[in-house]
From Swiss-Prot:
It catalyses: aminopyrrolnitrin + NADPH + 2 O2 + H(+) = pyrrolnitrin + NADP(+) + 2 H2O. Homodimer. Binds 1 [2Fe-2S] cluster per subunit. Binds 1 Fe cation per subunit. This is Aminopyrrolnitrin oxygenase PrnD. The record marks D183, D323 as: Important for catalysis. Changing F312V: Unable to convert either the alternative substrate pABA or the interdiate 4-hydroxylaminobenzylamine (pHABA). Involved in the biosynthesis of the antifungal antibiotic pyrrolnitrin (PRN). Catalyzes the oxidation of the amino group of aminopyrrolnitrin (APRN) to a nitro group to form PRN. It has high substrate specificity toward physiological substrate aminopyrrolnitrin, p-aminobenzylamine (pABA), p-aminobenzyl alcohol, and p-aminophenyl alanine. It comes from the Bacteria. [2Fe-2S] cluster binds at C69, H71, C88, H91. Its EC number is 1.14.13.-.
Length: 363
């Protein structure tokens, strides 16, 4: 992230705002697509309700820009990559990684290139980054106001962890997705977690978790936790896990939230088992994609690792599907009768609204 310039002038404390739900987007980093889906051809996508095209430049850098050519509006996703630029399929105008038109071909051998290039021949681009197997785009201001979260366990080349990426489409608002981790009350009704008690925690001092320093200094860190007292392992693999000696009495969830998502660290009886990155692709109104990357600590031999992958990876993916089913029937900005157990959800909403207020414009 050192190559991404932050807009330091805009990073300052703002009023927290009301604890209401919002369908608006916070200024933050969002996922455009999986890295392995962007190869040597332009890819059509929609972000923030905006038609976009993604492609890789000469250096392999991911570029995301407006999809329709500034000339006559042709679809650049139907074009191709030529000399490190994206070439329009209609008149072969070429745009570089910054969105500037750098070449307009002539009409015959005598006139090989038209000059000068029209001043308005430019494609608006989004700030991009690439990490954790995702292409990210910044939303809300010309320059990023906070960095990507630092998660060494989630780096795809970290051989100490097993990684599982998955995604679900949903019709709910982004806030509903990113606040879900902080809702302790749904653990039993939705996920059948056999809990006898839970404790909600809020953290103001980031220094116990050095990886969040850059987020915290930008005012973009939301620290929280839930400690569940659990009777036994849950789900269809409970019997197998107990047979392997994987019993537990405490499930400790630590959350390093940021405006566009969350990093959850899961420990059982104090032993960290995996980290989960939750992030979102805002597609258009009424359509978003929740992404999750689970990084599971490698322990023991093949059987133990396979069990952990199923228990912490595949079962978590299945559990996420239960949440999505609920979300798809929710009113995105509904509700309002809160209990004391909604404390973390409401605190996160206030944090999130502060970053909604930092959005410079919708474009």
């Amino acid at each position: 992230m050192n190559d991404i310039q932050l807009d330091q002038a805009s990073v300052k404390k703002r009023p927290s705002g009301a604890y209401d739900a919002t369908t608006r987007l916070a200024a933050s980093w969002y996922v455009a697509m999986r890295s392995n889906e962007l190869k040597d051809k332009p890819t059509e996508l929609t972000l923030f309700g905006r038609p976009c095209v993604a492609w890789r430049g000469a250096t392999g850098r991911a570029v995301v820009m407006d999809r329709h050519c500034s000339h006559l509006g042709a679809n650049l996703a139907d074009g191709r990559i030529k000399d490190g630029c994206i070439q329009c399929p209609f008149h072969h105008w070429r745009y570089d990684e910054q969105g500037q038109c750098v070449h307009i071909p002539g009409h015959n051998q005598a006139v090989r290139q038209l000059e000068p290039v029209p001043r308005g021949a430019r494609q608006p681009t989004l700030v991009t980054a690439e990490r954790y197997g995702y292409v990210w785009v910044w939303y809300g201001s010309p320059l990023p106001l906070h960095p990507l979260p630092e998660i060494s366990a989630a780096d795809v080349d970290n051989g100490d962890f097993m990684h599982l990426h998955f995604a679900f489409e949903t019709t709910t608002a982004v806030l509903r997705i990113v606040e879900n981790f902080y809702d302790a009350q749904h653990a039993t009704p939705v996920h059948a977690l056999p809990i006898s008690a839970f404790e909600l925690k809020l953290f103001d001092d980031w220094r116990q978790w050095p990886e969040v320093e850059s987020l915290a200094l930008a005012g973009a860190w939301f620290g929280a936790g839930i400690d569940f007292t659990v009777d036994r392992y849950f789900g269809p693999l409970g019997m197998l896990s107990r047979a392997l000696g994987l019993n537990m009495s405490q499930m400790n969830l630590h959350f390093d939230g940021y405006p566009g998502g969350c990093v959850m660290t899961v420990a059982l009886d104090g032993d960290v088992k995996y980290k989960l990155l939750q992030c979102v692709t805002p597609v258009s109104e009424g359509k978003n994609v929740m992404h999750m990357l689970i990084s599971i600590k490698k322990v023991g031999g093949i059987l133990r690792r396979a069990t952990d992958f199923v228990l912490f990876g595949l079962q978590t993916r299945q559990a996420a599907g239960y949440d999505v089913k609920i979300w798809n029937g929710m009113k995105p900005d509904g509700g309002g009768a809160y209990s004391k157990y909604d404390k973390l959800v409401l605190k996160y909403r206030a944090f999130y609204r502060g970053w909604v207020d930092r959005v410079a414009s919708e474009r």
